[in-house]
């Protein structure tokens, strides 16, 4: 797979395609994603982790910002608690295969005079309404936001400038913040970043993924947990908004390269699929039972997540 195909597979959009193609031709190219420290790293996080691994393979230098100050502004705990979680998150990302990346703790770069001045400069240009809309898009609808929450998206923009990256990766819910960065960073002397957006996948029940809703698979889940959760997963006959197919498309195929459906001969015997599109067609045609699809997804996820358990526990 050529670098462009690697970078763009399983993405929703690239802003802009022309800029990305030009960037790929450069000898040095840098990309980043920021993660607010989370006590539970799950399949939602893994979508962008997978994309960063694609970018590494395509020759990009990858920076991962563990945004401890962002988490503090978003009331996720004390700084001590958040930093402990941040270290756990870093180990999880490395266990998932994202090694050789430059891991940066937000507070190590976000408390300098230069950073703060850039935040203040951008705050003069961005209205409260636009800042609030960008936060609403990432799932933080706020009827009565604090000033700190309005600073959040501006800091995210300055992160791009401070880290010296050429491109930013995020879920499609980050689009409004990224578009603000493209619009305003040139006004303070920084280039507009290429923006690579990945899909937001559904929770196991077909609804919005949320740790609090219990509809996620975490990297810390045991084999039994994964099997139980997959067995209960929503798996309609349709391919649209099917969380089991999404797991296979965005997690299993990029890592395993192929998927095996194991079943007794009386139910059609084993089948191998080298491409997601072939599996989707077979499922849509009724050639694969939902339970067989769930079992295949569970087996592959167990294989994918096993190294995470080993890596995190060994440190």
UniProtKB/Swiss-Prot annotation:
Positions bound to L-tyrosine: 32, 152, 156, 159, 174
Enzyme class: ligase
Gene3D superfamilies, A to Z: HUPs, Tyrosyl-Transfer RNA Synthetase
HAMAP family (UniProt xref): Tyr_tRNA_synth_type3
Subunit: Homodimer.
Role summary: Catalyzes the attachment of tyrosine to tRNA(Tyr) in a two-step reaction: tyrosine is first activated by ATP to form Tyr-AMP and then transferred to the acceptor end of tRNA(Tyr).
Protein's UniProt name: Tyrosine--tRNA ligase
């Amino acid at each position: 797979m050529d670098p462009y195909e690697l970078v763009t597979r399983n993405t929703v959009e690239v802003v802009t395609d022309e800029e990305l193609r030009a960037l790929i031709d450069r000898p040095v190219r840098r990309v980043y994603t920021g993660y607010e420290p989370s006590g539970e790293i799950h399949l939602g996080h893994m979508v962008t982790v997978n994309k960063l691994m694609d970018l590494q393979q395509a020759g990009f230098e990858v920076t991962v910002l563990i945004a401890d100050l962002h988490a503090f502004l978003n009331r996720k705990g004390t700084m001590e608690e958040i930093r402990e979680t941040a270290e756990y998150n870093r180990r999880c990302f490395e266990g998932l295969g994202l090694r050789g990346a430059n891991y940066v703790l937000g507070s190590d770069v976000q408390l300098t005079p230069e950073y703060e001045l850039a935040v203040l400069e951008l705050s003069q240009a961005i209205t409260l309404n636009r800042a609030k809309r960008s936060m609403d898009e990432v799932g933080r609808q706020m009827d009565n936001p604090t000033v700190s929450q309005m600073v959040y998206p501006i800091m995210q923009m300055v992160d791009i400038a401070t880290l010296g990256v050429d491109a930013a990766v995020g879920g499609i819910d980050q689009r409004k913040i990224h578009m603000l960065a493209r619009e305003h960073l040139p006004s303070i002397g920084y280039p507009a970043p290429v923006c690579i957006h990945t899909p937001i996948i559904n929770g196991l029940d077909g609804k919005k993924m949320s740790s609090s809703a219990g509809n996620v698979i975490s990297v810390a889940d045991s084999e039994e947990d994964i099997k139980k959760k997959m067995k209960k997963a929503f798996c309609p006959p349709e391919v649209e908004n099917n969380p089991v197919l999404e797991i296979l498309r965005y997690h299993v195929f990029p890592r395993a390269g192929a998927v095996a459906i194991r079943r007794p001969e009386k139910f059609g015997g084993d089948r191998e699929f080298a491409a997601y599109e072939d599996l989707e067609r077979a499922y849509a045609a009724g050639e694969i039972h939902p339970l067989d699809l769930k079992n295949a997804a569970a087996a592959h996820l167990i294989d994918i997540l096993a190294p995470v358990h080993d890596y995190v526990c060994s440190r």
